[in-house]
Amino acid sequence: MGEGLGGASTCLLVATAGAIVSYIPIGALAAKIGRKRTIQCGIVLLAACFMLGYVLTTTYSSIQPIMYVVFALVGLAWAAINVNSLPMVVEMCRGSGLGKFTGYYYAFSMAAQVVTPIVAGSLMRAIDYRVLFPYAALFVALSFVTMCFVKHGDAKAEAKKGLEAFEDMDN
């Protein structure tokens, strides 16, 4: 796109701001619809944003205001995934297994953060920088497939007691 690192940094800043603003509302949403569903919604939104990012970066030669909206949505989608992932791992573990599974979670997360810049960078060097968004969308879509196999990890709603049990009767 010819924007250089400044334009890319601004897009990353917008995505980070979108995530920060979304963390608490995403937690509340997950309490209503479940962590798994929230993560899956985040994955779908993230893949769509990456594909839209591809279309926008191949259509325009400079950063357009719509791209900032897309990157803010990237942040929201990332928050939906990030806020709920570790709590799902913790919810699935029993006592002594918690450390082991937390270790797996972080080992695989960090391994992906080390490997993907190498693979994506090699693809961008061999093909073009435009391969980055489809590459990201592909792996986000693959993460959706893995989430379809998750059967545990959603918090169980606790039964309300006393007067709290009558709060939702008006709705």
What do the PLM-derived regions correspond to, one by one?
Residues 80-94:
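Intracellular juxtamembrane helix-capping segments at the cytosolic ends
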Residues 136-170:
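Multi-pass alpha-helical transporter architecture, strongest
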Residues 1-17, 65-66:
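Loop-to-transmembrane helix entry
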Residues 5-6, 93-105:
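Loop-to-transmembrane helix entry/capping segments in MFS-fold secondary transporters
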Residues 45-61:
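C-terminal ends and interior cores of transmembrane alpha-helices
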Residues 122-140:
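A membrane-interface helix-boundary motif in multi-pass transporters
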Residues 32-44:
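Cytoplasmic membrane-interface "Motif A"-like loop-to-helix N-cap segments
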Residues 21-35, 124:
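Helix-to-loop junctions at the C-terminal end of transmembrane segments
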